[in-house]
Amino acid sequence: MSEEKPKEGVKTENDHINLKVAGQDGSVVQFKIKRHTPLSKLMKAYCERQGLSMRQIRFRFDGQPINETDTPAQLEMEDEDTIDVFQQQTGGTASRASVPTPSHFPDICY
């Protein structure tokens, strides 16, 4: 009987996956989630913990966007894999006026 209990424990452990969510600021939040649970659950929990809105950020795994309906199993995620979080950019590009040029700073070597 004692041999069966570890097997059950292994089975339960295999049903879950540990994932890391890495923010642009270098912070890492760890989550344990079932392999067939939609990642929207993890995404919402991350936003609540960090005080962010789902509309402000985007989640990516291996460079690809994650949909709320995706599961770790569908994306072939493995234990300890990392999901990257990016602020959603709104608006255009940086203004050239904000980039220093030699004429504005003659003492700086370029």
UniProtKB/Swiss-Prot annotation:
PROSITE patterns: UBIQUITIN_2. Pfam families: Rad60-SLD (PF11976). GO terms for molecular function: protein tag activity; SUMO transferase activity; ubiquitin-like protein ligase binding. One of its GO terms (cellular component) is nuclear body. There is a cross-link at residues 5, 7, 11 (Glycyl lysine isopeptide (Lys-Gly) (interchain with G-Cter in SUMO2)). Belongs to the ubiquitin family. SUMO subfamily. Interacts with SAE2 and UBE2I. Covalently attached to a number of proteins. Interacts with USP25 (via ts SIM domain); the interaction sumoylates USP25 and inhibits its ubiquitin hydrolyzing activity. Interacts with BMAL1. This is Small ubiquitin-related modifier 3. It comes from Rattus norvegicus (Rat). The gene is Sumo3.
